[in-house]
């Protein structure tokens, strides 16, 4: 059974045993919506049309977005360093460019490389006349030393890159060559751009990632039996996916509504 916990992640992480986590899957609040400065740039929608008025706020926060408050990254890394199994434990962060910059600056010597999640749908239609719609999200991989990685190739019937007769040429002139027909069955290495449809379902957390995306990362950055921690678990999709893949999932969420939904699901 997954371990489903409610509360401030920085406080609950303090209660977990040292060197107990094999993989951190983190989707920390970016701070894009939950601030009064950002609210000033957001417009209230009426019947799908921007009114030009500020969105309604409560205590300086956009309604429904009180969860989007940045956590103390220094305190976060302090707990990560205590909890990680060893110096090769991967710490994976979903982020946009602005928040990703803050993540790197907070632990620059631990940053290893980035991945891109290429979504099926773009967002930001209201700004489509000013900038391209956003259809990707960054995934940053951190570790104290080289992050553990367990290669898992993709399989399928891959499209041929070419299929034609070729003419070889040397000092003796053109020489007929046999038809080139590469074998496109079998396995291929994964690339740094992950093409995967986004999912939007009523009742899910606003930033929930697809189960298949979590599975992609979990299978490549952990082994069966490992412990996976999601410190801001939202709908706990990462935790349930970890359990399905024979890992031990631990999720922490402050919001009572999402916490109770996860409890009901795990019962």
Please provide the spans of the model-predicted regions:
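Core catalytic lobe of class I
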Residues: 1-259, 267
